[in-house]
Amino acid sequence: MRTILLTSAIAFLPALAAAQQTTSATAAPAAAPAPVANPVATAFRENAKQVGKNLMAAADDMPADKFSFKPTPAQMSFGDIVLHLAQGNDFLCGTIGGQKAPQRTKLAATDSKDVLVARLKETFAFCDQVLATVDDTKLQEQLPMFGGRTMTRAAVMTLTTADWADHYSQSAIYMRINGLLPPTAKRPGA
């Protein structure tokens, strides 16, 4: 009986393998994800929205009396960081989007938290507006930058995200020194 079962199994295996090949050959392939139009600009915009959200949340979460905080005398205060980001957003996003930065009332890092946070939010709204027009066909274009130099649009985009990451980590450290959790350390819904 064992011999019959073993012989049947051996005889049946090639047929089983052939059936599997036929089934997999006729089965519909898994649908590939649709290609993203302008993958570089799209990725940049998605990153800009997330990092902007984190930076604005950090500014919202830092108590007003801590906007003058700086870990050492040589460092920027938290208010300096918020103001620097707002000014940088207007210049960098305007440059990337090929638009002049809006003319805004001059602020100081010592202005109130409400004033500084409102300005930061205005500048991220400006970034969202102008970055919506950027596409991958113009990444190689030379743009005017600091000190009369030029950089490609792609390089300015990279510089911008690096600046945001730098100042988000700086803000997160300032928050932790003051016993606060930065936005990215909080559990969702907390």
Predicted regions and their residues:
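Short, helix-capping/interhelical loops that line the mouth of catalytic, cofactor-
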Residues: 21-43, 87-149, 178-190
